[in-house]
UniProtKB/Swiss-Prot annotation:
GO MF entries: calmodulin binding
Pfam family, one: IQ
Taxon lineage: Eukaryota, Metazoa, Chordata, Craniata, Vertebrata
The protein, known as: IQ domain-containing protein F5
PROSITE patterns with a match to the protein in the record: IQ (PS50096)
InterPro entries cross-referenced by the UniProt entry: IQ_motif_EF-hand-BS, IQCF
Source organism (scientific name): Bos taurus
Length: 149
């Protein structure tokens, strides 16, 4: 083997090494690209999961807040209702006392009207008792009702 052949072999080896380096570099770059794509896919999936988790946490917190607000409003309405009912009962008691005294006074000074009625299919039965001091008058009447057919 002469020097020419050695030089050609060196150049061939350089070309072979250069092609192998290019091919290995291509394989490494492809592998790195696939790894980067897979990492990117995993990151996107994880970000979506985090968004869902945060949304669920936000919804749970909002539901808890809404329930708490509803309970507060309900409690406030019950307290207001209780206060108004107490006031109403006090006023009702006062009205009943006034009515008792007024009825007693009215009955003893002017007289009173007492009676009841009975409503049947097509007639009204009235029974009234009117008292004016020592005089009393009783009225009983049956009134036919006009019925449109």
């Amino acid at each position: 083997m002469g020097p020419k052949v050695r030089i050609m072999r060196k150049e061939e080896n350089k070309a072979i090494v250069s092609i192998q380096a290019w091919w290995r570099g291509t394989l490494v770059r492809r592998t790195l690209l696939h790894a980067a794509l897979r990492a990117w896919i995993i990151q996107c999936w994880w970000k979506q999961k985090l968004v869902l988790l945060m949304e669920n946490r936000r919804r749970v917190a909002l539901d808890a807040f809404a329930r708490q607000e509803w309970a507060v409003v309900k409690l406030q309405s019950w307290v207001r209702m209780w206060c108004i009912r107490l006031r109403y009962l006090r006023l009702l008691h006062a009205v009943r006392i006034i009515q008792v005294y007024w009825r007693w006074h009215s009955c003893h000074t002017r007289g009173f009207i007492q009676g009841h009625y009975d409503l049947k299919e097509n007639q009204l039965n009235l029974q009234l008792e009117i008292s004016l001091g020592s005089q009393a008058c009783r009225v009983q009447q049956c009134i036919p009702l006009p019925i449109k057919e």
